[in-house]
Amino acid sequence: VTVYENEGTKVDFDGNLRLLL
């Protein structure tokens, strides 16, 4: 499971793009 974080965004292991609050 890899999580990628960049400039207030986050992509979870399902590939969903989310905003970090």
UniProtKB/Swiss-Prot annotation:
GO molecular function, one term: porin activity
Free-text function comment from the UniProt entry: Structural rigidity of the outer membrane of elementary bodies and porin forming, permitting diffusion of solutes through the intracellular reticulate body membrane. Binds carcinoembryonic antigen (CEA).
Full protein name: Outer membrane protein P2
UniProt keyword list: Cell outer membrane, Disulfide bond, Ion transport, Membrane, Porin, Transmembrane, Transmembrane beta strand, Transport
Subcellular locations according to the entry: Cell outer membrane
Subunit structure: Disulfide bond interactions within and between MOMP molecules and other components form high molecular-weight oligomers.
GO term, biological process aspect, one: monoatomic ion transport
Topology within the bilayer: Multi-pass membrane protein
GO CC annotations on file: cell outer membrane; pore complex
